[in-house]
């Protein structure tokens, strides 16, 4: 996702592999902030080909762009679990659990950053 902000990162392009759900999430976030992405399915086993056919995939070798992978008004929210380039991980202090979240919306191009302090620990089931 950061590759769409080369002024901040110095990164112009990113290559990677992952499963389809991760690709859809990345495509959705990139749609929201003006980035580009292409992806294709790797159907290298009969099980994967059958599953794709059952899900309605008609062109198994097609290269999809970000608008084909994430259609409509897309909203993507991500909260850091461990520290990364985009988000800080969860922080535990004596009285507070701190989280950092980013929320993207394609219809408006809005990016919201939320830094939250959670004081009700019971909801996290940390026992």
Describe each PLM feature range:
Residues 106-108, 116-118:
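Non-transmembrane, aqueous-exposed alpha-helical and coiled segments at domain scale
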Residues 113:
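Extracellular glycan-interaction surfaces
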Residues 121-127:
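Short, surface-exposed linear segments at secondary-structure transitions and domain or protein termini
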Residues 1-105, 121:
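An extended, acidic
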């Amino acid at each position: 996702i950061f590759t769409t902000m080369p002024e901040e990162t110095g990164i112009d392009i990113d290559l990677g592999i992952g499963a389809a759900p991760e690709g859809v999430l990345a495509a959705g976030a990139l749609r929201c902030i003006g980035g580009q992405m292409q992806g294709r399915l790797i159907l290298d086993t009969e099980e994967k080909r059958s599953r794709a056919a059952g899900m309605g995939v008609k062109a198994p070798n097609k290269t999809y762009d970000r608008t084909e992978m994430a259609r409509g008004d897309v909203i993507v929210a991500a909260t850091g679990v461990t520290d990364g380039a985009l988000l800080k991980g969860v922080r535990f202090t004596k009285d507070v659990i701190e989280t950092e979240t980013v929320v993207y919306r394609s219809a408006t191009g809005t990016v919201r950053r939320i830094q939250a302090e959670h004081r009700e620990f019971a909801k996290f089931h940390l026992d």
